[in-house]
Amino acid sequence: MLTLNSTIKSVTGSFQSASMLARFASTHHKVLVVGGGSAGISVAHQIYNKFSKYRFANDQGKDTSLKPGEIGIVDGAKYHYYQPGWTLTGAGLSSVAKTRRELASLVPADKFKLHPEFVKSLHPRENKIVTQSGQEISYDYLVMAAGIYTDFGRIKGLTEALDDPNTPVVTIYSEKYADAVYPWIEKTKSGNAIFTQPSGVLKCAGAPQKIMWMAEDYWRRHKVRSNIDVSFYTGMPTLFSVKRYSDALLRQNEQLHRNVKINYKDELVEVKGSERKAVFKNLNDGSLFERPFDLLHAVPSMRSHEFIAKSDLADKSGFVAVDQSTTQSTKFPNVFAIGDCSGLPTSKTYAAITAQAPVMVHNLWSFVNGKNLTASYNGYTSCPLLTGYGKLILAEFLYKQEPKESFGRFSRFLDQTVPRRMFYHLKKDFFPFVYWNFAVRNGKWYGSRGLIPPHFPVN
């Protein structure tokens, strides 16, 4: 029989337990996802779906199912962006507003706990992270999906030029600046139009030339192309990393008489906005030279986030060191990484994320359940290369730049190196639709496989 005192103690204990559980739920997660971008949101949904569908105890008899709130997502951004849409924005086919949703709207509270903060530091030896406010969040398993840092400050004078509305310097590589690109393309009637691409790592390495081809086509359609000298300065040794598609791009430049002047191993290092001059460094001999411009589309350098580069998770390049097949950290087995923040040796695109995510999720689930990591990522990535209004080359390839085309079996009459309207509408209409309605809504989009998830052996 309970006494009054024991009842009070019981009730008090229940409140204390509830308080402790509430605090625990907000600071500890079985799975913690760092990043609320394309990779983070997609993979969080897939993790939830996988662990909900396959609920059973692991070999040690431990319940490995995930309950609502046991997956945490850490990201301080207010908005989530469909960044592949910024090329369309720059071409006048969309707007930044159409590529934007509030991040919280993509993180249903009945599944996930959103921590609206940025990460300050990672402590994988202690299974925790620290946010900018100083909050510590611990985890059993960590998924790194933090994206890449766009370093505008590395090019002297670039930020100042972009912030000046009277200076014809633009970029599609930021939600802050992408809407200004198309108006400047419209206003340019003559002179020198320069488009740049930095050396080194870059998210969507085809985008710097996509916007160039779209601008060139716009000027041609509006009968001013003959008045404009169009140049592309790239810090890379080739126009595109895969020879098959690089050759196709060069072929259409020559055969269609587009007359874009392509300069290799020349990197933009400074923008003199008031003088309308761009300073380049030749990467072969280190020499500097200037070029005047009437329109400059500049692509900033990119690098790993500092909190990753300075952590024990990083490889020598500053990205998360992972096994290129399993996406598991090579340093801490309870850590996985996908997307732009990972050291996976493939092009950093959203298409790559769609192929990496189910592999990572299956291997995480297998690891939690004491199984072998049987899913393998083959490096698949894709770059829908806009070459003009109504035209697109659909580049798809694996590790080592080996082409792997979705329509390869139909290549006799559907060559993916030939710009086609069908491919154009995939980029312009279909991909944005499936992104918002499947990929970040419920995680049920698997890239080249469409709505059909891959199946991996369990052993």
From Swiss-Prot:
InterPro entries: FAD/NAD-bd_sf, Sulphide_quinone_reductase. The active site is at C204, C383. FAD binds at G35, G36, G37, S38, A39. It comes from the Eukaryota. GO terms for cellular component: mitochondrion. Keywords: Cadmium, FAD, Flavoprotein, Mitochondrion, Oxidoreductase, Quinone, Transit peptide. Transmembrane segments: none annotated. Binds 1 FAD per subunit. It is found in: Mitochondrion. The keyword Oxidoreductase applies. The keyword Phosphoprotein does not apply. Its EC number is 1.8.5.-. Its main location: mitochondrion. GO terms for molecular function: FAD binding; quinone binding; sulfide:quinone oxidoreductase activity. Catalyzes the oxidation of hydrogen sulfide, with the help of a quinone. PANTHER family: SULFIDE:QUINONE OXIDOREDUCTASE, SULFIDE:QUINONE OXIDOREDUCTASE, MITOCHONDRIAL. This is Sulfide:quinone oxidoreductase, mitochondrial. It comes from Schizosaccharomyces pombe (strain 972 / ATCC 24843) (Fission yeast).
